[in-house]
């Protein structure tokens, strides 16, 4: 059914927040990569739960597809409107609704950006630990993909900081799940069902988040090793020693060289084959004790140096290279970003396999990521291939990479989500029984499949 302008105008009184067909900007028809494009009949900028509910109810009654959207930083096509219909944008729902110091919680709208939330709470002596790399992502999007980031090794992922949600189901029903209480053994955890569902089950309209006291101090350490295998083995020893690092990143020298070239910052010890970059936070005495403990462990386990980054400027430069790696690759060539996860005991094995796959296939594959949790970020680089060759070789290499990750007991994504681009590999590697349960839940909550259909786990549908 065609989208009725009048019907949407009856729900959204402000016409500036309604765009139709040819007036919809191109960036709203894609994800952050901009390499896949959808179509849409209408773009709606909602400002309230009531408006979200009204739009969903109208769409459900008329069989109109809905694509939820936040800041649009998604990398796997979750925000691409595959079947036309309505793009429901909640980016203007971006307010802090309540800060409750007694329960150490904050309630925000889904369009609030991660960087704004972090700044808001840190100015007040508080701390929101989840820290995915894209700081301009929205909190609703972080919840929808269960985003993680570098601090997951110590603090966990977004799921661990969501106390409650207000969501709107496909038929317009407003649902409130969770709350300010710490414990809950009352029935099924609907909150956890919704987290990570990539907009396929409901649209988030309010987020109740758990906060911590802001750490007293934060110090980073750069540890060079002769090779990645030695570095990763050292990480396992560090984690088992209760040194409690906040972040543990790994980078091979060939990857660091790209980041250096792009950022203009040079790493010390260019003779190293790999680097482990750690951060410690907490009380100053605790941080210093952990730094010293890890110094002994690292040097005893093959580190060729141990560089404590005491100045904020020095630490910022070192982290600038780490943060620039994806942009450094993009500056050279189109690339497909992947965030496969393996058990931490297999991180070095998996990266070694990726290097072998690169050599055998001739397709450049650049791996780095979170050594503390086994989340490997992989850039598969196009390097001038024509479209047909690129699509074929990308698919072949991805099939092999995902198969190897699953053979180690890994999964398809640690924080980006599945969306469109990872869906074929996820569907192939996931047990049919698991997919059947997921799709039964989808059909129960969205029987008409109006919400983000044919994304992630969904089979059948339209």
Predicted feature descriptions by range:
Residues 1-462:
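Noncatalytic alpha-helical scaffold of FAD-dependent oxidoreductases
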